[in-house]
Amino acid sequence: MKNFMDEKFMLSTKVAEDLYNDFAKDMPIIDYHCHISPQEICENKSFKNITEVWLYGDHYKWRLMRSSGVDEKYITGDSSDYEKFLAYVKAIETAIGNPLYHWSHLELQRYFGVYEVISEKNAPVIWEKANKVLNDGLTVREIIKKSNVKAICTTDDPIDSLEYHLKLKEDTSFNVKVLPAFRPDKALGINKDGYTDWVSKLAKVSKKNINSYDMFLEALNDRIEFFHSVGGRVSDHALDYVPYLEASKEEVNTIFAKALKGEKVSFEEETKFRTFTMKFLGKKYASLGWAMELHMNAKRDNNTRMYNKLGPDTGFDSVNDNGVAGPLSRFLDSLEKEGSLPKTIIYSLNPNDNFVIGTLLGCFQGTEAFGKIQFGAAWWFNDHRDGMVEQMETLANLGAFSTFIGMLTDSRSFLSYTRHEYFRRILCDLIGKWVENGEVPNDMELLGRITKNICFNNANNYFEMGL
């Protein structure tokens, strides 16, 4: 029997141990997609207690607590921080098999030196030890440095001032790149509440009178240029469905004018608007050498009552099953045939799409980057051992495994960098099993190089970080 979460955790062969310890463990981190706050990095936020850094804003943990029968007052309500901490400890104690069980232990081990098993019995000791470390100076920047993070790409609205990115760019005391990522979901949300208000804000920040679709595109173009000047090299799109329906610019201009008047547009009109706008954005990204991330098949805000109470991103999303093969293929092809397909990273929350993505990759590759079209890392509800292995095995079966740009946190928590360790252990174990089974040669120079590339080097080159 193996020890619980020791140095051999998830490493089932000697090759896996050697790959992890000699090649993966000490590689730096590029967290190229996350939702952490650049303001909190800039201001070097400190935390009063473990609850603030461990549970605040972490809807993964909130969701588990609800699934364990915890009352909402101990999750997002007005209970004390210790009561919330204890409620989570009780929930996670019985959540064996859930990746949160491993992540939570890794977070306590790596940042607080707490190796006690998370349990109600150990809760007072964990609370005391973790809080002492926080009080001794474990700030946001210290967490980032301790994690060996070299670059972070946040998720930012086109109208964002990027004030804190600019300040961090000039801050010579902090040697980590904090770069914006362009997230134009609100620009595409023509049927969403508050759309005209958002367009007004875009007009203000871009200093343009947006009274036509052409002016709207000009404003988006200017914001992309601004993001680029601050160091942005990646965009991100959360697609509740993959839009593809051709339309002329005149037709889209009419649709946009209709929306500006506050009129409801049909689903067909929305799809035409999104298709045309996405193609415009894709061409712009390609011209600047950006990468475009496409996150598909999330069904968001399923619980109306809780959405009205807490808002989005609070733990009430699920996997969707919209068909992606047809529209995704047509969208990529529409850009490729004009020579304007940017580097693209494709994620689906639905693992049934894995072979769709895995086979589409090979249809649109190019020489602009090593692995120009990427099968994105296992995402969100797939962010566990089985999901990661399935994603990597699919990529290996259908494409070029060694071109993979590896892991990201996609997180709102600064403690989530341990997910990179989790991924690296699983990566090394997978390769180790291939060696054990005689499926790949026991060539540590080759395997070590592939491992280091997937952990860091591929992403460094793909995003042109220069690290």
UniProtKB/Swiss-Prot annotation:
It catalyses: D-glucuronate = D-fructuronate; aldehydo-D-galacturonate = keto-D-tagaturonate. It is an enzyme of class 5 (isomerase). InterPro entries: Metal_Hydrolase, Uronate_isomerase. One of its GO terms (molecular function) is glucuronate isomerase activity. GO terms for biological process: D-galacturonate catabolic process; D-glucuronate catabolic process. Pathway: Carbohydrate metabolism; pentose and glucuronate interconversion. PANTHER family: URONATE ISOMERASE. This is Uronate isomerase. Its EC number is 5.3.1.12. Keywords: Isomerase. The keyword Isomerase applies. The keyword Isomerase applies. Pfam families: UxaC. Belongs to the metallo-dependent hydrolases superfamily. Uronate isomerase family.
